Amino acid sequence: MVQKEKKFMRVKEMDDNSWRRVTGGYIGGSSHTSLLLNHNIRNKIIMECVGRLRSVDHDCIVVCGTSGLMVGPQVSEILQKNLVIVRKEHDNSYSDFCIEGAYSPRFVILDDLICSGKTIDYILRVIHNEYYRVECVGAYFYLQDQCAYQNCPEKFVTKYNINYL
């Protein structure tokens, strides 16, 4: 069987987006990751998250994946909330733990909602399987304009509770 050579996009082939240009270089990568790698845009996203989540009654912030780890730690630090990281399914990692961080009963999910939206279902399933008395009080989608769900109602969905029997 002949394997096709994987073609990688070259930086010069990318759209000429001004936000990709930074001091000393050009941010390469997928559009949503590149947005978060631009520190000016990432800081605006972080402050928007903080502003929206400050009044929400929760104990911790849950993230999953690389983009979540670019935003979640700063948001949780500013809000003085615990941070919980849920590893993606089949993640080849040095850790044997699927969930890492300080357990808290009321949590908010921070997610980019880029692909299929299955991350939210996965996070809820994993946390509810691990901990019995937890409540997801909401999910905040910080890249709504990049959202895979074009019919996404609003960025913060209060009482985003799913019961798993």
Task: Label the model's feature ranges.
Residues 1-165:
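PRPP-associated nucleotide enzymes
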